């Protein structure tokens, strides 16, 4: 699997610790039970790495959520049209529809 070669013992220990502490989030993100476990720390580190080009950072639970956040940040909403390719994953279309915009297939 591409990418495995960059995972060393430090990363393996961090991942194991998260599993051992029962703080793994799969499909439903950063709920109150998990208290944003490691997420806010990670966001701050990202902000530091990309500063000053990036004013703020936000972690989301899925690619669909990321598309929704990006569309909202751009002010996309009812009355707008968003062009996307027709051969695509359904989440792209769902995110556009969720904003109230109209999907235009390219």
Describe each model-derived feature in a short phrase.
Residues 1-72, 77:
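Conserved PLP-binding active-site segment in aminotransferase class I/II-type PLP enzymes
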Residues 72-106:
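PLP-dependent aminotransferase-like
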